[in-house]
Amino acid sequence: MAVEMASQSQVLVEEKSSVRILTLNRPKQLNALSFHMISRLLQLFLAFEEDPSVKLVILKGHGRAFCAGGDVAAVVRDINQGNWRLGANYFSSEYMLNYVMATYSKAQVSILNGIVMGGGAGVSVHGRFRIATENTVFAMPETALGLFPDVGASYFLSRLPGFFGEYVGLTGARLDGAEMLACGLATHFVPSTRLTALEADLCRINSNDPTFASTILDAYTQHPRLKQQSAYRRLDVIDRCFSRRTVEEIISALEREATQEADGWISATIQALKKGSPASLKISLRSIREGRLQGVGQCLIREYRMVCHVMKGEISKDFVEGCRAILVDKDKNPKWEPRRLEDMKDSMVEQYFERVEREDDLKLPPRNNLPALGIAKL
């Protein structure tokens, strides 16, 4: 009973005629996704899809975050207690939710008025409409935690213009709302002062046809200018460097750029890469590259294999160490193992992409007569 009450208080539900508004409600934790929240969201999304009276689902966050990611601190506690399979249950449920959202037959509007990181991207970017504001801060910061951009990120990052996805995924770079709109992570940009009116108009929708939501959103959307220092203005440099075959070659290319141009952005990018977990950087790059040629379902199945290896910690224990340094002790000084990129051999990277011994692959549900490896609508 207490579990059910927790999941209901952490995800609030409003019914507005044919529209359902879901609010992530753990503001003190920046709406980090607990296992209860993931289970509740999955239950609600499946129920709304079956209910012919529901035409549109709106998802938003309470407080200054939409969702700052998954509750990885809880997963690390399980790992430290010898229960990595509890963590596997968490990620399998989360990836199932990502897949349901990516293949959803009804329109989903995510209002990203604040922090959107990691798992927060997973419950929004796969949906049809993503609304950024002047308060939006987006990032996939996993390589600094010894993890990798998951929740289907190898699908959506690999589909950004040029090699911008590799840049975002490897460096953990923070994007604002204008940058999200420019690169396609957001579909619309609406000033936060207009969100109440927008929501009221969306709640008048009484049709499954997404063009009704699209027409309303188009009437509210603005096209903000990119800041002068925006990374998106440096897409030519990003493409030259992040198109390289290996992480080592990416860093070398950036260092060559730095000798030709005194640009603080280039040096900050090099520093971000050098601070990340070598194991995480290498598996992240390969994951995004493989994602370009795969459907969203295939990406999630592969990412589940990868995350099981990360949690088992037999190849590298960087996930536990990264969470210790960033989230627990907060000394921001992780001791990565292996310590250097060149010590993370290709044979070690390869192991992350193999099925974990005595562990089943992620089994995705059949969706609307789509193949189980259906393509999402990014």
UniProtKB/Swiss-Prot annotation:
Loss of function mutants are defective in beta-oxidization of fatty acids and in the conversion of indole-3-butyric acid (IBA) to indole-3-acetic acid (IAA). These inhibitions may be due to the accumulation of a toxic intermediate. The mutants are also less tolerant to freezing stress after cold acclimation. NCBIfam families: PRK05617.1. It catalyses: 3-hydroxy-2-methylpropanoyl-CoA + H2O = 3-hydroxy-2-methylpropanoate + CoA + H(+). The lineage of its organism: Eukaryota, Viridiplantae, Streptophyta, Embryophyta, Tracheophyta. Its main location: other. Its EC number is 3.1.2.-, 3.1.2.4. Belongs to the enoyl-CoA hydratase/isomerase family. Pathway: Amino-acid degradation; L-valine degradation. Expressed in roots, leaves, flowers and siliques. Disulfide bonds: none annotated. It comes from the Eukaryota. The modification N-acetylalanine is found at A2. One of its GO terms (molecular function) is 3-hydroxyisobutyryl-CoA hydrolase activity. Keywords: Acetylation, Branched-chain amino acid catabolism, Hydrolase, Peroxisome. Substrate binds at E94, G119, E142, D150. Inhibited by copper. Involved in valine catabolism. May be indirectly involved in benzoic acid biosynthesis and in cold signaling and cold tolerance. InterPro entries: ClpP/crotonase-like_dom_sf, ECH_dom, HIBYL-CoA-H. Induction: Down-regulated by sugar. It comes from Arabidopsis thaliana. Changing D150G: Reduced activity. One of its GO terms (biological process) is valine catabolic process. It holds the Pfam family ECH_2. This is 3-hydroxyisobutyryl-CoA hydrolase 1. One of its GO terms (cellular component) is peroxisome.
